[in-house]
């Protein structure tokens, strides 16, 4: 693949995302550009050569700079400080939880609706992969509510390899897919090689469910011993968030009890647990390092779930106020994942007030 053609799918994805954000159909964008819907479809799939003039016209039609024309070499930012911030802002939904929930949607053959999903690049890439294997994904409104419909049989042979290789999160497909296919392959996950420290903990956990993975030609060749389940507690060799999530995803469709030790109790893991509970999976120990999961042989239910707010975004906003010596109001802060940091900042001289606690839309996470 040449350097030029390698950029076409990326530009196409940017055009598609900007069009959807603008609320336009392919036909409406085509009419604005004076071209055909099929041409717009080819552009979004990265199958159409584009001139700079056409890219500029698309950008104007969508009120979005698709490609920035800058100089070569390193970029530099000039920051003019001493600007005081003011006002109030709501913390948006967790990006990491959103990614985990997209992978978890593969467990459910019913309709999954996720509320206020963060439309980050990782989410866009995962959606490209999901739709390529047969999942129907629909953005419902401007609030970024997302509907997912997973078919009874996935077309894993049609997986979008280019999109899969641009996301490390593809490794979290192993957990749900090992129950849905006896043999399948996944492209290497964004620079993660089999046997490295970042990948091996996943394999160690998933072997308990009969998964065997061999790396060949930039793909994970996976085979599964159907009906295999843990005969003893799974001890994670790394207390990682995605490792814990992968083990949870595998345990959810194991019709029996799975004990996961050395699990991450982090916010995105808890959000995944709350979502799995809505699917009918029973989980004990949420928020601790030992999880006991009672899975099911199949899941087919209509579920509506809102991931909680992002503590990283909340702390970024608080930090912005601190360094600019500002007084702002940050609403919908997931306080249980920030109390230690705020206590340390208070010892350093930070003064702040906080409201009474209330629950997030998931009915579980404590906010202030």
How should each PLM-predicted stretch be described?
Residues 9, 20-21, 49:
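Short amphipathic helical patch at the helix-1/turn junction of helix-turn-helix
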Residues 31-49:
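Recognition helix of helix-turn-helix/homeodomain-like DNA-binding domains
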Residues 15, 26, 37, 52-55:
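Helix-turn-helix DNA-binding elements, focusing on the entry/boundary residues of the two helices
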Residues 13-32:
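Short basic helix-loop element that most often maps to the first helix and adjoining turn
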Residues 9, 13, 17, 38-41:
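Positions in alpha-helical segments
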Residues 43, 52-53, 57-63, 68-368:
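Structural preference for solvent-exposed beta-strand-turn elements
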Residues 1-9:
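N-terminal flexible/basic segments that precede or flank functional cores
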